[in-house]
Amino acid sequence: MWASWIPVLCLGVCLLLPPEPVGSEGAVPIPITCSTRGLDIRKEKADVLCPGGCPLEEFSVFGHIVYASVSSICGAAVHRGVIGHSGGPVRIYSLPGRENYSSVVANGIQSQMLSRWSASFTVTKGKSGTQEATGQAVSTAHPATGKRLKKTPEKKTGNKDCKADIAFLIDGSFNIGQRRFNLQKNFVGKVALMLGIGTEGPHVGLVQASEHPKIEFYLKNFTSAKDVLFAIKEVAFRGGNSNTGKALKHTAQKFFTADTGARKGIPKVVVVFIDGWPSDDIEEAGIVAREFGVNVFIVSVAKPIPEELGMVQDVAFVDKAVCRNNGFFSYHMPNWFGTTKYVKPLVQKLCTHEQMMCSKTCYNSVNIAFLIDGSSSVGESNFRLMLKFVSNIAKTFEISDIGAKIAAVQFTYDQRTEFSFTDYSTKENVLAVIRNISYMSGGTATGDAISFTVRNVFGPVRDSPNKNFLVIVTDGQSYDDVRGPAAAAHDAGITIFSVGVAWAPLDDLKDMASKPKESHAFFTREFTGLEPIVSDVIRGICRDFLESQQ
């Protein structure tokens, strides 16, 4: 029964018609905020009014044409071209959930991919009403009940003491089954909630291991615990073999990229849940993860009983997959029942950043100084080939103010610091400076140059956590002793790679190089032969770095 009746004159006959319900065609559009989501509108069809001037960061959009209900309505409307950034009326239609929401750039908005969601919506041009869009976000009336919704709260910053990018790699195999799969999701949800997810805290995503790995959602998809919990709940059981190794390798290689939300300088973590044992080899996947700087935690549940051990490819699979076999990265629960008491200890591990040893790699935790021969025997054109050699090594590393650092010194009888470790913190700037180094020309005093570099370049960073390397490139015999200065550099913890060209004596190269000499000293007859040595030096740096971390 309608609460009131409105007289309407039609062809001379006065009729009593009920007023249109809120949200129906012809009704005044309901004002909403920039971040109001499709799931906040609980009608099959509703007319809403989007404000103008919404910041793009409030437009969280998943899909194209058909959008997941967790998407911003106004963001979807701008994305589809229904309205512009000045706002306006929008009609929203509720649709069933689906799989594989696509990622598309449209009208200045990048929508995100989502593997599955329980409800969807689409948008069309709405009917204009008496309300007008403004640049101000307003409180919204709830279309289903007529109650006022609370103003959308600001995004939570999260636990700043637990900054980490975390992928939960859950077991979706027939090993675990549907019932224990749901218990696993509940446990992961509790861990996610306790972590303190937020814009400046931990970010999480989820991958399901089964016959083929499936990334359920990425780090960038959700930055609130509420949305993460909802997304975890929506993950469907896949079944198949527990190819955990395949899934771990896929996660290490594809999950932690800038495009998917990985942050610079933040520890990368994969928490692998294994019910029983994996169906494939997990050791190689662990090696790949370490090479990518990913900290692998293994949460094993229900160890195989003696009668099942013959079915396990490698009973030591946990020790071979984790970041370090020191007990910190492995975690065991007897079963999936009564797991609440295991949540806090796991969270404490995930938030202990000083233990995240695999975040440090040879690519982001080294200081590399290049000592470049600028003597007269080199010549301008060959000097440029030397600089190309230096650039090709430098560009391999993750140069930043918290990552790898590069310095360069040119020497003849004299020495000139081209740039120090603290001068440039981006790869682009470092490579540009190397290209523009001018050729000095003069004699060759390599010993003095080593002492100068140790004192003036490495001295200011002696307390740096990065491992120190010196790459010497020379084309001739030094007029001074190299043995003493090189030994002093070794004693100072600096690993030396010596690279000789043309007339450089092999004895000098070996005297300067760190041990074992055969893997730290290189020689080529021609300057064009420097290029193949690039990969040898990079491999050597990474090998020495890994050995120093054992």
Curated annotation (Swiss-Prot):
Stretches assigned to the VWFA domain: 165-350, 367-537
LCCL domain boundaries: 28-121
Compartmental location: Secreted, Extracellular space
Signal peptide extent: 1-24
Residue span of region Disordered: 128-158
Positions of disulphide bridges: C34-C50, C54-C74
Top-level lineage group: Eukaryota
PROSITE patterns the record matches: LCCL (PS50820), VWFA (PS50234)
Listed Pfam families: LCCL, VWA
GO process terms (BP): regulation of cell shape
One cellular component (GO) term of this entry: extracellular region
One GO molecular-function entry: collagen binding
Keyword annotations from UniProtKB, A to Z: Disulfide bond, Glycoprotein, Repeat, Secreted, Signal
Compositionally biased tracts (Polar residues): 128-139
Subunit structure: Monomer. May form homodimer. Interacts with type II collagen. Interacts with SLC44A2. Interacts with ANXA2.
Reported function: Plays a role in the control of cell shape and motility in the trabecular meshwork.
Protein name: Cochlin
